[in-house]
Every structure is written in C-alpha cells, then in structure tokens.
Amino acid sequence: MRTYLRVERLVNRLSDLQAGTSEHDHHFALQTLFELMDMGSRADLRGDLLKDIDRQKGVLAGYANNPNIDESALNDLLRQLDDAHHSLNETTGKLGHSLSESEFLSAIRGRMGIPAGTCEFDLPAYHDWLKQPVGARQKAIAQWMRSINPIPSVLKLMLGLLRDSAAPHSVVAKDGMYQQNLPQSRNVSLIRIGVPDGAGWVPEVSANRLLISVRIMRIEDGHRTQSMKADVDFLISNCG
C-alpha cells in the first residue's frame, strides 16, 4: 500500500511539472520520472495491481443481486476493473523500462545522482534540450510519460475504490491518544485521518491487523514534535 501511495505522489507531481513552463519545471519532471523508474525496478507494481484487481472483483461480485445496490453502477465498476486488468496484461517489463534504452535519458539519469551533476559542461545536449520551446519540451515529456502507462490510471481507479470504501467518522483522542480495535473479519488496508490546515498538530499512527493506535503530536518551534496532552477531535476512515 505504501508503494502505491508513493507512486501516486510521484505521478501527480510529474503531471504538475510536465504542465509547467520553466526549465526548472521540466528538469524536476525528468527527475520525478527517474524516481518512478527506480521504484518500478524494485517493486512488481503490475503483478500487485493484477492481484488486487482480482480481489476487488471478488468483493464487488458479492454484491450482485443485492436489492440495495445500484446494479448499473456495480456493472460499470466491474467493467472498469476488467478494462484495467486487460490493459495491465497487455504490458510487459518494469515501470518505464523502455526509457532505459534512450542514451539521452540514461546520460541525464546517471548525472542526476551527482550534486550539481547536470551542469552545461557535463550535459551540453541536455541544456540544448532545455532551451527548446516550452511546447516541444512538454510534448517530449508527455511522450516519455506514456512509458509508465497504464499504471497511473489503474492506480487511480484502485485507490479511488479503496478510499470510497469507508465514510469518515468523528473520534476523540483523549489526552492526545486514540486506540481502536479492528474486527478480525475485516481487512483494513488504508487508514485516513483528516487534519485541518494549520491545525498545529500531526498524527503519529501505528497499526496491525487488530489495533489502530494514533498519538497526536504538537508541532513546536523548529518543526519539532511533542506529544499533546489535550483532547483532540478528528475524522478517521478505515478503508478496506
């Protein structure tokens, strides 16, 4: 799950940077693309997503013929899962593996691991590319981004279904501590906690199959954290 969330964060960042117009935007877009390739080389995202799609289809199939369920919406979700499964089966190799064959990108990737390693005298061809018109750079990055398809769209579908599987409910952390027992019959894959902007505190979460534990940490000067000794209301969703 943490791998899914990290990939989602990188994909969103890459999309934002690709749409940018400055040389710095597109430099960091490539850096983000290389981070995605690094993650893809260490994790079998395709295999994990295929397993999770099959599991999700099994869960949704259990709602068939339920009078309280919108059959049209259910069939639409099952169709989306079938399409996602098919698109993943049509792909081969690791995330972005085809980009490894580009000498241009491989040279940039190799130098990005070195502090200030992408100066003009290190990578003149790269800096020539950075001086191209904005539209040309955006088009090139969009083309390179296709190498990670269909992972972003499949991941968006799966995480969306997971997040929508539970409604948030209000709880109170007494003296900054909250614990909740989990039923053995339910598999919780993701815990979501609502933190208001500027709240001045962050949650420190630990969990296993049977118990969720949340400690509220106050943010002090210097961005240090300290256990809070006050009651705190917050929203929590146990998704799974």
Model-found features: residue ranges?
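Generic structural signal for well-ordered, non-transmembrane alpha-helical segments
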Residues: 5-8, 12, 34-38, 54, ...
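Charged, well-structured binding/catalytic surfaces in domain cores that contact anionic ligands
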Residues: 84-189
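Hydrophobic/aromatic-rich structural module bridging two neighboring secondary-structure elements via a short loop
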Residues: 41-104
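Extended, charged low-complexity segments
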Residues: 187-240
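N-terminal ordered "arm"
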Residues: 1-51
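Conserved phosphate/pyrophosphate-binding and hydrolysis machinery centered on Walker-type P-loop NTPases
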Residues: 23-26, 71, 141
